[in-house]
Amino acid sequence: MKSSFSVVIAGLALVFCVPGARADIGINPRVGLLGYGIEISAGVSDRLSLGVGFNNATRKRQGTTEGVDYEYDLRLRSGEVMANFHPFAGAFRLRAGALLNRNEFILTGRPGGSGTYDFNGTTYTAAQVGTLTGKLSFNKSAPYLGLGWGNRPNGSWGVTFDLGAVYQGKPKLSLEATGGTATPPTLAANLEAERQQAEEDLSSFKWYPVIQLGLYFRF
């Protein structure tokens, strides 16, 4: 979290050091698949602005991976530095930049309906496994490409819309079972095989879609 704030602070310093940028400042609160966020931008010309922002949200989901039920605590936290190019000096814009990506899934395993887990073809009771936890994380530096509408330099106020994608790389999965009664080496080996297979199943999740809707005010 502190790293995300550091990116925003450094980005603000860079944006406001751009010659002529102080004359046109935009504030853009928004909500979308990156969470609740805000961007502060400075117009460099009638077609270009530079912005920094921060996104944050927590969401809970449930699902099944490799036959194991999980509760997912999705933590969305990212800082961003963006360039917004308005090719026609109007509302339409092309958008590119980078995120300091702290997005992650915190996983808590739940036994199936029979009260058991199945790891790598071996069945364990809930008592044998104990507490099953994990984390799904991504590249910390993630480029962004997209297009959007609104928040043009020298504008006044209005609605913004963004559609794009973040390249976050292959997900990295960790799993750990603690406090159980199963023989540690055997459980650890099967849990590692389960982790590798689940990570492979998730390997195509390299791009994170971005849809955002917000308001902008420029002064």
Predicted regions and their residues:
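Short coil turns and loop connectors of transmembrane beta-barrels in diderm outer membranes
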Residues: 23, 44-50, 88-90, 153-155
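Bacterial N-terminal signal peptides that target proteins for export
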Residues: 1-9
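Hydrophobic, lipid-facing positions within transmembrane beta-strands of outer-membrane proteins
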Residues: 25, 36-38, 48, 77-81, ...
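Transmembrane beta-barrel strands of outer-membrane/channel proteins
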Residues: 27-33, 52-56, 94-102, 161-167
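Residue-level signature of outer-membrane beta-barrel architecture
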Residues: 31, 42, 85-87, 98, ...
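N-terminal signal peptide c-region/cleavage motif recognized by signal peptidases
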Residues: 17-18
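Outer-membrane beta-barrel "beta-signal"
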Residues: 84-88, 93, 157, 205-219
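Extracellular/periplasm-exposed beta-strand and loop segments of Gram-negative cell-envelope proteins
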Residues: 54-81, 103-141, 169-210
